[in-house]
């Protein structure tokens, strides 16, 4: 397999990533369409704000600016829509503990296997005893999805950090604590740090171990993906027939 670096990390399709795995959990058909380039999602303003902050702290801001010129005015300043990114950065830099968490080895790329499936990870900040993932979010409120869920569960951050911890341990021989360093995009940004219990990470890892082989076979074209029937991709592929009529 190709040796992964920061430069080619997002180009490689041979490895499963945490983001890719979470896509498969949502909808197998949608995830495969994204991998094949058959379904391209529009980049949201919220995603770009988070990307700007991430790039700033990982010292990749100049590359980010070159890729996303639409964020900037002719004089190089951020457009009004994205100004909140500067407020978030300012708030983070005022907090010594947040800055400590983000001063580890940044954007560390590693590879390994889970249940025989090749995985790749790219971590925001790795300290001697902790893996830190930075999240720039709308807020930290629980999210409704057929009942309220904690934001970290709703967005699969437990899955993500479980993958990071497991693959990093394969490379380094030590299981490190996993934390989320969160800043919100509110007018007065909130800062929060969440430490995952090992029980939470172990439970999430079991999901990965159980599902990864199936998702890998879908990527290889050995089995057909199952659509959720609810996401935007599935709705775009829906073909009506007489049996789907609704009586009113």
Residue ranges of predicted features:
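Hydrophobic (often cysteine-bearing) scaffold residues that line and stabilize catalytic clefts
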Residues: 45, 49, 160, 204
């Amino acid at each position: 397999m190709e040796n992964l670096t920061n430069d080619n990390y997002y180009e490689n399709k041979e490895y499963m990533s945490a983001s890719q795995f979470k896509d498969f959990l949502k909808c197998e058909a949608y995830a495969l369409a994204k991998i094949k380039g058959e379904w391209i999602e529009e980049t949201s303003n919220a995603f770009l704000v988070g990307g700007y902050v991430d790039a700033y702290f990982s010292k990749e801001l100049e590359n980010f600016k070159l890729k996303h010129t639409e964020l900037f005015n002719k004089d190089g300043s951020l457009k009004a829509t994205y100004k909140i990114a500067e407020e978030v950065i300012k708030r983070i830099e005022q907090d010594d503990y947040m800055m400590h968490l983000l001063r580890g080895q940044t954007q560390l790329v590693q590879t390994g296997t889970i249940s025989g499936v090749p995985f790749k990870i790219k971590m925001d900040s790795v300290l001697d005893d902790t893996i830190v993932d930075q999240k720039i979010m709308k807020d930290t409120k629980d999210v409704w999805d057929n009942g309220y869920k904690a934001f970290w569960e709703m967005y699969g951050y437990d899955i993500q950090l479980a993958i990071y911890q497991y693959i990093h341990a394969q490379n380094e021989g030590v299981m490190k604590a996993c934390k989320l360093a969160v800043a919100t995009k509110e007018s007065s940004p909130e800062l929060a740090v969440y430490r995952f219990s090992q029980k939470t990470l172990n439970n999430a890892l079991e999901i990965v171990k159980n599902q990864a082989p199936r998702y890998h076979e879908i990527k290889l074209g050995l089995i057909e993906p199952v659509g959720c029937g609810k996401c935007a991709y599935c709705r775009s592929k829906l073909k009506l027939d007489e049996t789907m009529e609704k009586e009113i």
